[in-house]
Amino acid sequence: MYKRQDVGYGQLAWKLRSDPRVVCLERTNARYLTHEQVPDELDFASVDVSFISLKLILPPLNGLLKDGGHAACLVKPQFEAGREKVGKKGVVRDPAVHLEVLEHFLDHAGDAGFTVLGLTYSPIRGPEGNIEYLGYLEKGPRQERTFDLKALVDESHQTLKEHGEGGNP
């Protein structure tokens, strides 16, 4: 069974919408998802949210995943950093802000009952050119893992800089 949730509507491809394995929950804020809406415990979730911090999404997500379940989360600095750290057109260019965002993501994931198994940068920039990151989480007791966040941020900026400031490399 596949579940798809979106605060918007009419965005899910018809092929998926008409698949009986897909339950589409439109006009639904992920912060308030409950077991009544998603009665089956999920093995996996992919999270790509806008205009809201993952800090607010991870706790309810934990309640929907089965123990040992996994989630892939797109970490968007423009929605994690705070308004005062976001530049023109919603773009975060400062590597120090990216580093801070990733440190907070690790903390928020752990606080919400997840272990971060993997962390990398997305090879695809956001629409305005934002560098974004991907976190791979597992529900269960928090296990401390070490990531070289500075090296990750440096690599993301160096690699994606070679592809210009546009959306996709």
Regions found by a protein language model. Name each.
Residues H98-A112:
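Short alpha-helix
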Residues M1-Y2:
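Short, small-residue-biased leader/transition segments that mark boundaries at the very start
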Residues K55-A72:
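A short glycine-rich, Lys/Arg-flanked "PGG" loop and its adjoining helix->strand segment in the class I
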Residues R31-F44:
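A short acidic, Gly/Pro-enriched loop at the edge of an enzyme's catalytic core
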Residues I131, G135-P169:
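Flexible, glycine-/basic-rich loop-and-beta segments that form/coincide
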